[in-house]
Amino acid sequence: MTITPSLKGFFIGLLSGAVVLGLTFAVLIAISQIDKVQRSL
């Protein structure tokens, strides 16, 4: 039973890391898209 808390924390860390990575990629893509639009104007 001592394994479950560490596993829970591990999964929470993985999830938060994935969310942070996803947000970072979304921001980078948005910035590049905005840059393209501004250059085409």
Curated annotation (Swiss-Prot):
Lumenal topological segments: 2-6
An annotated GO BP: photosynthesis
Keywords in alphabetical order: Membrane, Photosynthesis, Photosystem II, Thylakoid, Transmembrane, Transmembrane helix
InterPro entries: PSII_PsbX, PSII_PsbX_type_1_subfam
Keyword Cytoplasm appears in the UniProt entry: no
Residues on Cytoplasmic side: 30-41
Cell compartment(s), UniProt: Cellular thylakoid membrane
Membrane topology type: Single-pass membrane protein
Main location: membrane
A matching Pfam family: PsbX
Cofactor: binding comment: PSII binds multiple chlorophylls, carotenoids and specific lipids.
GO cellular component, one term: photosystem II
Signal sequence bounds: none
Keyword Thylakoid part of the UniProt annotation: yes
Regions that span the bilayer: 7-29
Family, as annotated: Belongs to the PsbX family. Type 1 subfamily.
Role played: Involved in the binding and/or turnover of quinones at the Q(B) site of photosystem II (PSII). PSII is a light-driven water plastoquinone oxidoreductase, using light energy to abstract electrons from H(2)O, generating a proton gradient subsequently used for ATP formation.
HAMAP family associated with the record: PSII_PsbX_1
Quaternary structure and interacting proteins, as annotated: PSII is composed of 1 copy each of membrane proteins PsbA, PsbB, PsbC, PsbD, PsbE, PsbF, PsbH, PsbI, PsbJ, PsbK, PsbL, PsbM, PsbT, PsbX, PsbY, PsbZ, Psb30/Ycf12, peripheral proteins PsbO, CyanoQ (PsbQ), PsbU, PsbV and a large number of cofactors. It forms dimeric complexes. Part of a photosystem II (PSII) assembly intermediate complex PSII-I; crystallized from a strain deleted of psbJ, it forms monomeric PSII before addition of the oxygen evolving complex. PSII-I includes 3 assembly factors not found in mature PSII (Psb27, Psb28 and Psb34).
Protein name listed in UniProt: Photosystem II reaction center protein X
Source organism of this protein record: Thermosynechococcus vestitus (strain NIES-2133 / IAM M-273 / BP-1)
Underlying gene: psbX
